Amino acid sequence: MSVKHFIQITKPGIIFGNVLSVAGGFFLASKGHVDFALFLAVVIGTSLVVASGCVFNNCIDRDIDHKMERTKNRVMVQGGMSLPLALIYATLLGVAGFSLLYVQANPLSAFCALIGFIVYVGFYSLWLKRKSVHGTLVGSLSGAMPPVIGYCAVSNSFDLAAVTLLVMFSLWQMPHSFAIAIFRFKDYSAANIPVLPVARGVLAAKKQIVLYVLAFVLATLMLTLGGYAGLGYLAVAAAMGLYWLYMAWGGYKAEDDSKWARKVFGFSILTVTALSVMMGVDSQTAADVLMTYAR
């Protein structure tokens, strides 16, 4: 056991992706008036909560991770950390993260983090991931919480913008996850995990990917139409979303499903990154947007 194991088991890549969306929500609510001390506390607090959830997930999935090529080298599978130590580590990370959000931000942001944590660890990892084709749908709620946490840490209000962020990022999770399940089809089959491509076929997953990307595109526009983001954000959201939709539609004539799914997955990362950045740099008040439309 080494320091490397303590880092690896938290899934740093997932933490980094969540930090981007936290920042997007935070700067969207800040509207150019950024409290950097609060920002740092929110980023660290959310990262600790996400890390905690990932460690618990590693503990829960250790019996199926060894069956999958993608996860067979994880710390718990390789015996790099004992189960009791991992559980203690996960608990300490969670307590630290929730406490930081509650004390340095506000109870609302801590509550949002708690909901995401319960959904991911309890409903998804412990239950639905292994039992239901709808596990991805339920799990998407946890993946959508980080931008909401960032937004509520500033606004201290679960308003229309928070709802829009929750819907946007939940919808984004679905095609993103289905694409992974397609190009990792053999892994999920070997572990007997009933993701949509395994349970109902790749064609069914392709149809769902197109529908969810379309819904995502429409949802992204609501931040501008609702008066929370500017026209620059709108232009980027529309361009990225429509190209992602075009790419998703291409799945119907793809000769290599795995190659196509990897492209859809890769562009999903670019899309959510671009939107997170634009939410921060082009946030504005409803009055600003209305004045722009009126000119």
UniProtKB/Swiss-Prot annotation:
Name the domain of life.
Answer: Bacteria
**Bilayer-crossing regions:** 9-29, 36-56, 83-103, 108-128, 135-155, 163-183, 209-229, 230-250, 264-284
Its placement in the membrane is given as: Multi-pass membrane protein
Q: Which residues form the signal peptide?
A: none
As a miscellaneous remark, the entry gives: Carbon 2 of the heme B porphyrin ring is defined according to the Fischer nomenclature.
Stated role:
Converts heme B (protoheme IX) to heme O by substitution of the vinyl group on carbon 2 of heme B porphyrin ring with a hydroxyethyl farnesyl side group.
Q: What is this protein called?
A: Protoheme IX farnesyltransferase 2
Tell me the organism. Answer: Pseudomonas putida (strain GB-1)
